[in-house]
Amino acid sequence: GQVFPQAALEWLQAHGALVRLGQRVQSLGAAPQGSGWLVDGVPFDAVLLATPSTEAARLVSQCAHTAPYTWTVALCDWAASAQALRFEAITTVYLQAVPGAGGRTLPLPMLALRSSPQAPAQFVFDRGMLGGPSGLLAFVASASQGEREHITQQVLAQARTQLGLVQAEPVQTVVEKRATFACTPGLQRPTAQVAPGL
């Protein structure tokens, strides 16, 4: 949701940062003598590159042309590793259940579940305990595979078997196909810092 982005935005603005939202960056380059960065030609001391990996790879590849010579190989390597990332889906299945005493459906706001190929959800969140509608549960299946309806039915069976929620009914299923990158053995992950100030 909006909890973390809004808090980050407010903190940045309170500390004097210029935040521009809803603008696609066309170009990113190193300022002369590595004295900062040029975003669409506008100079900045530092840049937080918060984009999908494919977009980050595009922008960092451009940087290699204007960056100090000593950064060129590192920038190209970073762009290649970002471009090579493969994605996996995260599916969230929302079920409406009958809340118990005190409006709670689960004993805690979040529970870990036993997942398997037939029971794909790893976690469940009681949205009612987190400020949402009473009885609304969000089951999260990371690295999910398969059709939306099939996953929904698997999670519904998992809720009934593992949590005893026999009266739970599906409300909505959201599949974010590129939600995360695949954490595979030997993965060459791009580093958090691309170059000084980036």
Segments (PLM) and residue ranges:
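A structural signal for well-ordered alpha-helical segments within the folded catalytic domains
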Residues: Q2-Q6, T54, Q153
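Generic beta-strand hydrophobic packing signal
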Residues: A8, L28, V47, L111, ...
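A conserved beta-strand/loop element that lines the FAD pocket in flavoprotein oxidoreductases
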Residues: L12-V25
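A short coil-to-beta-strand element that immediately follows conserved catalytic motifs
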Residues: R20-L21, G164-K177
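Helix-loop-beta segment of a Rossmann-like dinucleotide-binding subdomain
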Residues: G1-H15, S142
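Mid-domain catalytic core of redox enzymes
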Residues: Q23-H150, A157-L163, P190-T191, A195
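Tryptophan-centered motif/residue detector
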Residues: G1, W11, W37, Q96, ...
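FAD-binding beta-loop-beta segment adjacent to the flavin cofactor pocket
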Residues: E176-L198
